[in-house]
Design a protein with these regions (language model features):
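Cross-family detector of peptidyl-prolyl cis-trans isomerase
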Residues: 1-165
Length: 165
């Protein structure tokens, strides 16, 4: 049991970034562009563009919109991520981050294992999920790894628009 607790501590982030805002839930965020209009409310459909990186494990991208993916130049076909805010379809960090944004805004978030993270017992259960096989391999290698690697993730999120569901 002691070894399990030690493993848990090693998979959690050790860094609080001073130029990021830290929320009571543990989410760290930094706004690059504020956007305009009203912030989305629970129950509304949100449409976002996002990038994801394994910040705690060599900074490897696992989702990069508008960039070459796996050697294929497929950035022209944009499929945005859509979900109902507060529905539980995605990790809690996405709901919390987007709820505080305005359309057109860009926010960077740092997410560590905890209540806002992918479930460690079944990380494939919640999104966001990479759109490519190589992206899935990069993300799930980190999330499903039983070793002592830092599972911290970094996401860049752009709120494209908000719609009534």
């Amino acid at each position: 049991m002691r070894a399990f607790r030690a493993l848990r501590r090693c998979t959690q982030a050790k860094n609080i970034y001073p130029d990021f805002t830290l929320t009571p839930s543990g989410l760290q965020y930094k706004d690059f562009r504020e956007g305009s209009g009203a912030s989305p409310r629970k129950g509304q459909r949100v449409i976002v563009d996002w990038d994801g990186y394994t910040a705690g494990y060599y900074g490897r991208p696992f989702e990069a919109r508008n960039k070459a993916k796996g050697g294929a130049f497929t950035g022209d076909n944009k499929e945005y991520l859509r979900w109902i805010l507060g529905s539980g379809e995605l990790i809690g960090a996405f709901d919390e981050a987007v709820a505080g944004m305005k359309p057109g805004g860009i926010r960077r978030i740092i997410v560590s294992p905890g209540p806002l993270f992918y479930p460690l017992d079944n990380p494939r259960r919640l999104g966001p999920k990479p759109s490519t096989f190589s992206g899935e391999r990069a993300l799930y290698f980190v999330l499903e790894n039983q070793g002592l690697i830092d599972k911290t993730l970094l996401f860049d999120i752009e709120l494209i628009r908000v719609e009534n569901a």
